[in-house]
Each structure stands twice: as structure tokens, then as C-alpha cells.
Amino acid sequence: MLYSPKKLFLFFLSCIVLYVNSNNSGFVTAANSIGLNYGLLGDNLPSPSNVINLYKSIGISRIRIFDPNTEVLNALRGHRDIEVTVGVKDQDLAALAASEEAVKGWFAANIESYLADVNITFITVGNEVIPGPIGPQVLPVMQSLTNLVKSRNLPISISTVVAMSNLEQSYPPSAGMFTSQAREQLVPVLKLLSQTSTPILVNIYPYFAYASDPANIRLDYASFNTKSIVVQDGSLGYSNMFDAIFDAFVWAMEKEGVKNLPMVVSETGWPSAGNGNFTTPAIASTYNRNFVKHIASGKGTPKRPNKSMNGFLFATFNENQKPAGTEQNFGLYNPSDMKPIYKLF
């Protein structure tokens, strides 16, 4: 998550499959396809083996890690019922973009030894680096990795993770369009993905929109807590901001000739502290619970009705080595005792 105030202002001015059941207490019970992000930027995190046991105990079958961490991947050995998305570090992109041999070396060093007993289903090339100075490095690395896994007939999808800063305009959703830099860097990636219908991974955070303009954005609209139509866009009505942001990205892709490309929600969530009354456990719980119920309904979005979405909630733990404030408080669990900050599962 990298959101500058300027980008947020411009973006919002212009404007998993998760299957769940609610038990009698109102808590959410995860079924087999919900995903969680597993970040490691903390000095008080539990051991990876304990984290994997936590995932198993709450029915988590998909996780996303931001780099090929050996401790985590070793802890996942034998747990092939958990699908793993592994990220390529941003700082590795320059060397990997230089040659296909470098990519083969990276794969051999970081992925090869885990293929037999870890269920690696996605490799993501860079995290929110498009648009940006190293954005052009994403496409050649994706091409090399795609060629590699295809040549070996490996069931691993290659993609990248992008933020909504790629949108120059997002309101109303049908006006969604990419920035000029995104058109230069992202559209070739989207066209590569469309050749095999491989999803693009997107980070969607209604929280940042609400926090940047609470006077004009309703909390219930941002947190999935109203069924009333808040934004009418032609024949399409929006009762939550998540759908509006998602569909703005869909519209932007279509304007570049990329249609029907799947999208995976690589991150979404709401911080439970760090920004006063905007970030409480109650609001965070409301957003995440309502998000899961919304996705589980199978309704899709107004632009893509009745189409399921895969996704990952952000994040498993509060991470005390991230920037102070909200960034440290997106976790569902306290790392020191692994107790929930609020009950979700």
C-alpha cells in the first residue's frame, strides 16, 4: 500500500472467491477459498509454523506472501491444501528484467525446491510499482516467467499487483480511465494477461477514499453498510464504494481494448487504529465482515453482475515495522498472542 496524499486527492477528486457463513453470533466462518495477506514487517511476529496452524484452524486456504521467504515456504511444506501467491521483490526487478537467464536463476533459487510440496499457484511481479520509475521492468520479467512456467507445464499463473493510482478518473465508474503513464506501462501487461485470461491483481481500499474526504463520502457507503443506491451511473446503481472502484478499473481496461479480463482483489481491508475515529475495531470489523458477505453473495458488481471474485483480506497481523499510524493497524490478529483484534472468523 503506497498512497501519497496527492495521488489520493487526484484519484478521489475525479471521483476472494470468498464463500462464508454467518453464525448466530454474527461472526464470519471462512470456507475453503478465502485468502489472507501474510506480511512480515514486524519484530514480534509468531513463527511461520504457528501462523500456518492458525490459518488451518480458521479455514484459510489461500495466502499471499510478498517475497519468497524461506521460513514461510518451509513451514508450508506438506500443506498443499493452502494455495500460495508469492511475490517477486521490487528491488529484484531490475536484475531480472535484464535477461531471461536471470529469471531462470531466480526461479531455481526461490521456487524450484518447493514445487513438490508447496502449492504455489501465483507469482506476482512487483507490488504497486506500476505506474512508476521501475514500472517498465515488470513486463519483461512477467514474459520470462510466463515462458518458463509454460515450457515446463507448471500450473502457476504470472501476474502483477497494481493500485488504484493507475486511474486518472474514477467517478462516475463509467468515466474510469487510466493515467498516461498507466497506459504506457500497464496496458501492455494487461494485453499479455488477456492472452491467457490470467487475472490482474488489484488493491482496493475504500478506507483511503473515506479518510481523505469524510465530509463528502458516507461511511456506510465506504463500509458496505447500506443497501441504498448512493451513486447512480446511467443504468448502474452503486450502494458501496468497493464496487464503484472495481468497476472504474473495469471501464478503464475496456477503453484500452481489454475486455473480460479477470481481476483478483489482492488487498482490501480497514485499519482498526491509527487515525482517530475513522479507524476503530468496530468500523474495521464492519467493513471486513460486510465485504466478505458481499463477495459471498455472488452478486458481483453492477458492471460485472453474477461474476465471482477471488481475493485476499489485508492483513493477518498488525506489523510494527511498517510506517507509524494506520499502516501498522490493518491486521486481524495481534502478533504477540495471536488473539483477534476483533472477531471475524
Swiss-Prot record:
InterPro entries: Glyco_hydro_17, Glyco_hydro_17_plant, Glycoside_hydrolase_SF. Gene3D superfamilies: Glycosidases. The active site is at E128 (proton donor), E267 (nucleophile). It catalyses: Hydrolysis of (1->3)-beta-D-glucosidic linkages in (1->3)-beta-D-glucans. SUPFAM superfamilies: (Trans)glycosidases. May play a role in plant defense against pathogens. This is Probable glucan endo-1,3-beta-glucosidase BG4. It comes from Arabidopsis thaliana. The gene is BG4.
